[in-house]
Amino acid sequence: MEKLLRLCCWYSWLLLFYYNFQVRGVYSRSQDHPGFQVLASASHYWPLENVDGIHELQDTTGDIVEGKVNKGIYLKEEKGVTLLYYGRYNSSCISKPEQCGPEGVTFSFFWKTQGEQSRPIPSAYGGQVISNGFKVCSSGGRGSVELYTRDNSMTWEASFSPPGPYWTHVLFTWKSKEGLKVYVNGTLSTSDPSGKVSRDYGESNVNLVIGSEQDQAKCYENGAFDEFIIWERALTPDEIAMYFTAAIGKHALLSSTLPSLFMTSTASPVMPTDAYHPIITNLTEERKTFQSPGVILSYLQNVSLSLPSKSLSEQTALNLTKTFLKAVGEILLLPGWIALSEDSAVVLSLIDTIDTVMGHVSSNLHGSTPQVTVEGSSAMAEFSVAKILPKTVNSSHYRFPAHGQSFIQIPHEAFHRHAWSTVVGLLYHSMHYYLNNIWPAHTKIAEAMHHQDCLLFATSHLISLEVSPPPTLSQNLSGSPLITVHLKHRLTRKQHSEATNSSNRVFVYCAFLDFSSGEGVWSNHGCALTRGNLTYSVCRCTHLTNFAILMQVVPLELARGHQVALSSISYVGCSLSVLCLVATLVTFAVLSSVSTIRNQRYHIHANLSFAVLVAQVLLLISFRLEPGTTPCQVMAVLLHYFFLSAFAWMLVEGLHLYSMVIKVFGSEDSKHRYYYGMGWGFPLLICIISLSFAMDSYGTSNNCWLSLASGAIWAFVAPALFVIVVNIGILIAVTRVISQISADNYKIHGDPSAFKLTAKAVAVLLPILGTSWVFGVLAVNGCAVVFQYMFATLNSLQGLFIFLFHCLLNSEVRAAFKHKTKVWSLTSSSARTSNAKPFHSDLMNGTRPGMASTKLSPWDKSSHSAHRVDLSAV
């Protein structure tokens, strides 16, 4: 019976429902394998239905509680949930593992999945966990076993690769002193020796884990299992291996459904003469049909765990290695691999599978000469598998690979001279591309945890070297002999840009993959960086394994005191600037009826003031928004537009000033529409283009602004730098003209105050030309604290400077305000209403109609100047 368990994550909870019956029979003549003696010692055995390729035992002594489906063990669906029932002892070792004593308990079964159904999973019934017992689950590309003892509130959990579409043997043992151990296909896969306290694990009155996740969007996964066995003791590793080989028929692969692997014409699982030839052939054929990376990974893992313990010739070892690595390489080319590789556990599991195959090849490699070496290169990796007698090697060290800028060296004295050594080396060509986005908290690198928000990434090839027996190495990094690891860096353009950015600090770690816990974890214990730069690193290590250089880019941060001070300056300065800009706009609006204030220059001042006002108000609001949210993204777009508009109107200010002081380009009316198009139209165009290509770069980092990492910030920086450069050029040209006029006035009239005119003009022009933003360019480095303070102060107070220089201290505005107050005063008097005359700009210049001015300003005293410039033009 291959009962389908229609669950995405199916749970097998063993309940106690004991039927007191015995089944008698006779042993099959073929069942004289010692592994069946291990099976005969079981306390409970359910062979279920006959499965081709899995051997069963018929009990002749009646010592095993044996049953069929719906007798002693049965499957039942309730409300869409498949439940697995058996036995009901309230004080049994099986029901309560804590009562097992020192002998422990063992559970064993064969398991496979059979694809997915299109309909959604029904709602889980209850959704609780069992009070006592264990759980087996397969979900999201990972299998797991959990065991719980309620009396002391302890939980043991271990993860392993799920079975995939082929029969896989899963067995786990538990002892109170040894914890949980999980064996896959007769080999120890993972363990949890210590467990953890879990007092809230389920409810005390719940008997059964209810069968599926509460996820309506997922689809069903058909599962099947066979040969369910319980021993009320923990089997030894030898017993587990013996039973496994007996069940599958002496080293045969696991499934009759495996595509003709090790199958004769009669479909009997027997070993062919060349044990490895069918594996190589099948890998070659299966590679042509690869479609789903997840399924193929499970298939390759089954192959790696089921290789026969037979010797390999050099040619067979070479063919098997090349074929297996080619199959792995083609997985990386599948469309679904990129998404699957985002789970680091999948990538590390693949590396572990490759290590298993290469270790098997090295341990079974035999040759007629003292030194046997099988080496080559594929699209996946360079490899070398060698069996050497160190005393026959004349070199002072063993190096893999022999050529290239990335290699590992072992000193000759580290080898056991009179013992055969097997050496396996792998230099992966592209695996480092999938070793990115590593959270420091998920590693054993203590230094990286100081910057937990900054991810690590592999910046070199992944290189592996294993030697058996292990070389004798110093356990002290200051001693000898030690392993030397030399790796060339392989930075992408983006990584190189981040690493060379002066506002970042780069940390480099000599790291290795630690599989001691059953899962690969990056660590740097026993390794030290001795030298290197941005292109390479050299490490010394006390052990061998998989090595890579990990890099961590950390943005430089100001001290907390500077951060608080700069933040306070920004808040206070922007708030004061907003008030002053409001006052400026109100002043221009009130005086708009006066002819001198109605001209184009003050229209430009008003538009600049409005753009800066809105930008700074939005900036103050953005400080309160959460990055990554929709309001923050909308705010980032608005900030981008209005700050660009502010810069555009600063450019208009510069061009208009240039036209007034240096050249005359035509009437003001003819330039009016161009100025408005430049001030409001160009920024809108830039924002639309930026949104079209980098919409995800708005408000997604640590603030409501453009992303620096994606390069979208250049949609603001490039136009801003252009405006700054142009306006600095205009400021220099205008300053030269003003300086010339001042010098002429001093020569002719001897007026020393004329020299003050240059300084005054520069002070008046700086706020409207935006040249103070140059301090923002100088403040990009975290060390330039003084420029950051200057930038924060000058730009947060831009509105204040505009109000001071272009309202309070502007002679035209003051004169217009005086005239306006007179008009208001005269308007209130009925005596002068009929005789009131229109106001003209002549009054602003201190003259009356028909009369010449009797007082010249410093601008007018130079009769030799090529330009007669009114002071108000500045």
UniProtKB/Swiss-Prot annotation:
Reported impact of Y85C: Does not affect subcellular location; decreases G-protein coupled receptor activity
Spans annotated as GPS: 510-557
Effect noted on mutating H397Q: Does not affect subcellular location
Site (Cleavage): L544, T545
GO annotation, cellular component aspect: cytosol; membrane; nuclear speck; nucleoplasm; plasma membrane
Phenotypic consequence of L808T: Does not affect membrane trafficking. Abolishes receptor activity
Annotated phenotype, changing R540C: Does not affect subcellular location; does not change G-protein coupled receptor activity
The protein's name in its UniProt record: Adhesion G-protein coupled receptor D1
Cytoplasmic side: 591-601, 656-673, 733-757, 811-874
Documented effect of changing C454Y: Does not affect subcellular location; does not change G-protein coupled receptor activity
Topology of the protein relative to the lipid bilayer: Multi-pass membrane protein
GO biological process: adenylate cyclase-activating G protein-coupled receptor signaling pathway; cell surface receptor signaling pathway; G protein-coupled receptor signaling pathway; regulation of skeletal muscle contraction
Reported effect, Y658A: Strongly decreased G protein-coupled receptor signaling
Post-translational modification (record): Autoproteolytically processed at the GPS region of the GAIN-B domain; this cleavage modulates receptor activity. Cleavage takes place early in the secretory pathway before N-glycosylation.
Record flagged with keyword Acetylation: no
Record-linked Gene3D superfamilies: 2.60.120.200, 2.60.220.50, Rhodopsin 7-helix transmembrane proteins
Effect of L318F: Does not affect subcellular location; does not change G-protein coupled receptor activity
Phenotype upon changing F623A: Decreased activation by 5alpha-dihydrotestosterone
Result for mutant: V270A: Does not affect subcellular location; does not change G-protein coupled receptor activity
Effect of R540H: Does not affect subcellular location; does not change G-protein coupled receptor activity
Sorted UniProt keywords: Cell membrane, Disulfide bond, G-protein coupled receptor, Glycoprotein, Membrane, Receptor, Signal, Transducer, Transmembrane, Transmembrane helix
Gene from which this protein is expressed: ADGRD1
Stated induction or repression of this protein's expression: Up-regulated by hypoxia in hypoxia-inducible factor 1-alpha (HIF1A)-dependent manner.
Annotated consequence of substituting S667L: Does not affect subcellular location; decreases G-protein coupled receptor activity
Stretch list, region Stachel: 546-554
Classification via Pfam families: 7tm_2 (PF00002), GPS (PF01825), Laminin_G_3 (PF13385)
Result for mutant: S268N: Does not affect subcellular location; does not change G-protein coupled receptor activity
